[in-house]
Amino acid sequence: HVRHIVGDDLFMKYSLTPARPGLTAAKIQWVKENQPQIYEKVEHILLPKDYLRYRLTGEYATEVSDASATQILDIPNRKWSDEIMTAMNLNEAMLGKVYESQEITGYVLPEVAKLMGITSKCAVVGGASDNSAGGVGTGVVAPGRAMTTIGTSGTVFAFSEEPVLDINKSVYTFCMPVPGAWHFMGSVNSCGASLKWWRNNFYPDDLEYEQINKDA
């Protein structure tokens, strides 16, 4: 339904991908239509790590890499899309301020600092989504660099200097947790389970995954 409300033209222009059922915008719309008694009580919408940020700092905020997967972010300009928010009847106060990943978003509240045994001068930065944090950690921070990860999902992740739209609609273009940079990402959500199924059905139980990789 979110496709009919927002339209793929707006999604493609700002989120650089058509409406996707697994991303946040579609989930918000589902709750609005199927659980209106819950949605009418909603004051803020936060991603998991951003809820932890709120508990630590009292700040409603997010950062560009994780916010890219909401389909509400204007990815080329690294800010919330006014057009998508208007179409969905959302506003920035509900979603929180958008930061770059390295920016300080707040400081640990005194009562939280006391509970944790740390100083209340401890800064909490924007952070990053799981795959983009992995990209930074493995050095995918320059043109020509890419990585592949296999866990629950299997992901191919590559650096980009520009917010390029994939005309085939097969990969995401999201903000990197590096200012002025983006990344391409393709993902198969069942990759880990598929690899385990292949190993269990076609190889001896004691065979290491390294041998499967060599065979592949």
Cite the ranges covered by each PLM segment.
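A conserved helix-loop-beta module that forms one wall/lid of the active-site cleft
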Residues: 89-100
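Active-site core segments that coordinate phosphate-bearing ligands/cofactors
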Residues: 3-61, 66, 71-82, 86-89, ...
